[in-house]
Structures are given as structure tokens and as C-alpha cells.
């Protein structure tokens, strides 16, 4: 009965996900651009407390009223976290935004911080209180289990990460258009080689635009045929040579590989 209720809830949630009140501006701007405010309403800012202040460290995606999806490498057991929702500019008070404490963190059991290229860079955060959905706070859709996007499929990475290698940290949410690089290409020796696994998804690699420091844990947003946006990736890692390095696309945890894990964690917690 509990499982039936959960599945019903997930299905009901899926009917009202990935469809922003304020649709994003989908352009081909090279180098990224400021996002339309609240056009990625599942995007969250994961923040940690230090000396009485809160600091942005990673992105994440709201996938249920009480659950946020992020990267395992964003999590440190010694830190206290909260999640900022409905945000655009992280440094001004914004109407309709929320800050909610994290009550539980579930990191994938096979994640190893010393071997990031082995994958499983995924974590779920349970919020201390479920959030009410508004025009500025909405749920992300997740793709069907096992979905593989074709080469050159257009997606958008979003976050408050650095604008370029060693560059400035933006106040407002940024978006960048990235084309998916298929596994055969991304795992070739001229690209990422054996560092990339089938449980990952690559996007970018043109030497111009990519995810960067501070984007980690955030979504790779890809539009489905029905017009809804699905989070296909979680920002995982990039090249030590720089954020925008040629033939070193951003590497994401492939969400469709972990749908069963996500549902299991939510069902049991």
C-alpha cells in the first residue's frame, strides 16, 4: 500500500513538473548568459554555514516537495547545509524565495571521493519541511530510466558557478547551451578516454562554454518532445586544464541510470 501511494505521488508529481511559469529564453548565445529570473524553478542553491553566514557551494534540483537531487562530491559530513529555492540573485532579498534546512543526506553507497571517475556522483537531500510549489518554486521532471540522449542533443546547464576558469562568480543565475557528446566520442582517447563511464553523460567540449566551479550538483536541463524540461545530468567534473577546455566536455552523472535508486531512497526515507 505504501509503495502504491508513493508511485501515485510520483506520477502525480510528474504531471506538474518541468513546465516553468516563466519559460526560459532558449538561445544559442556563445559563452553563456544570464537566465531569465525563475525560468529554471527547480534550480536550488546548496549552501553551507560558516561563522554565522551562509555560502553557496553547489547547485541542485528540486525533484519532490521534500527532496533535492545533487552531486555526492558536494557533500561534506562536517558541514551544516540549507537549500535556497526560488532564487535568482543570491545576494539580494527576493520575494517568493525560501531557505530550508536539510534534515537528511543520502549519498550513493558506491561513491568514492578519491575516484570520481568511477561514477555514482549522486546524492539526495531531504528537506526539513516540504515546500509548497509556486510560480518560482517548481519540480524538475526526471527522464525515464535508461534514456540515452543522441549526439548533439541541445541542453542547458544552469548555475551560479564561475563564468570562466578563475573568473568572477556571478550574483545571478546563468545558463549555457551545451550539445550532448555521445559515449563513443566522449570516451575516445582524444576526448575523456576511460575517465568517462556509461553511467555519465558528456555535453559541451567546444572550448567556449561549460560548467565551472560552483555549478557542481546542478542540472543539465534537456527539453523532451512534449515540451517539458527533464534533468538528464548532474554536474560532476571537468578538466583540470580549465573549465572551457577543447575536447574536454563537462561530465555529468546520468540521471536516467539512477531512477531506481532515487525512487528507492525516497520510498525508504
From Swiss-Prot:
SMART domains: Tryp_SPc. Residues 17-28 form a propeptide. This is Chymotrypsin-like elastase family member 2A. It is an enzyme of class 3 (hydrolase). Elastase that enhances insulin signaling and might have a physiologic role in cellular glucose metabolism. Circulates in plasma and reduces platelet hyperactivation, triggers both insulin secretion and degradation, and increases insulin sensitivity. Its EC number is 3.4.21.71. It comes from the Eukaryota. SUPFAM superfamilies: Trypsin-like serine proteases. It comes from Homo sapiens (Human). Expressed in pancreas. Not detected in keratinocytes. Detected in exocrine secretions of the pancreas (at protein level). Also expressed in a small fraction of cells in pancreatic islets, adrenal cortex, intestinal glands and colonic lymphoid follicles (at protein level). Detected in plasma. The gene is CELA2A.
Amino acid at each position: 500500500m505504501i509503495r502504491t501511494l508513493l508511485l501515485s505521488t510520483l506520477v502525480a508529481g510528474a504531471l506538474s513538473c518541468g513546465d516553468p511559469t516563466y519559460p526560459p529564453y532558449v538561445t544559442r548565445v556563445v559563452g553563456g548568459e544570464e537566465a531569465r529570473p525563475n525560468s529554471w524553478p527547480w534550480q536550488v542553491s546548496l549552501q553551507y554555514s560558516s561563522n554565522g553566514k551562509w555560502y553557496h557551494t553547489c547547485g541542485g534540483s528540486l525533484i519532490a516537495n521534500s527532496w533535492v537531487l545533487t552531486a555526492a562530491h558536494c557533500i561534506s559530513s562536517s558541514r551544516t547545509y540549507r537549500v535556497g529555492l526560488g532564487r535568482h540573485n543570491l545576494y539580494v532579498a527576493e520575494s517568493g524565495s525560501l531557505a530550508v534546512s536539510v534534515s537528511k543526506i543520502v549519498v550513493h553507497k558506491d561513491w568514492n571521493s578519491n575516484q570520481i571517475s568511477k561514477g555514482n556522483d549522486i546524492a539526495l537531500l531531504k528537506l526539513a519541511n516540504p515546500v509548497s510549489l509556486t510560480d518560482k518554486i517548481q519540480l524538475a521532471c526526471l527522464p525515464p530510466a535508461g534514456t540515452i540522449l543522441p549526439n548533439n542533443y541541445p541542453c542547458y546547464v544552469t548555475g551560479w558557478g564561475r563564468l570562466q576558469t578563475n573568473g568572477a562568480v556571478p550574483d545571478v543565475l546563468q545558463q549555457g547551451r551545451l550539445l550532448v557528446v555521445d559515449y563513443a566520442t566522449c570516451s575516445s582517447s582524444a576526448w575523456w578516454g576511460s575517465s568517462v563511464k556509461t553511467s555519465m553523460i558528456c555535453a559541451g567540449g567546444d572550448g567556449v562554454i561549460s560548467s565551472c566551479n560552483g555549478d557542481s550538483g546542478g542540472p543539465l536541463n534537456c527539453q523532451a518532445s512534449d515540451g517539458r524540461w527533464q534533468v538528464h545530468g548532474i554536474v560532476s567534473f571537468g578538466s583540470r586544464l580549465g573549465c572551457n577546455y577543447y575536447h574536454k566536455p563537462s561530465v555529468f552523472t546520468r540521471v536516467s541510470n539512477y531512477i531506481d535508486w532515487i525512487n528507492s531512497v525516497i520510498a525508504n526515507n
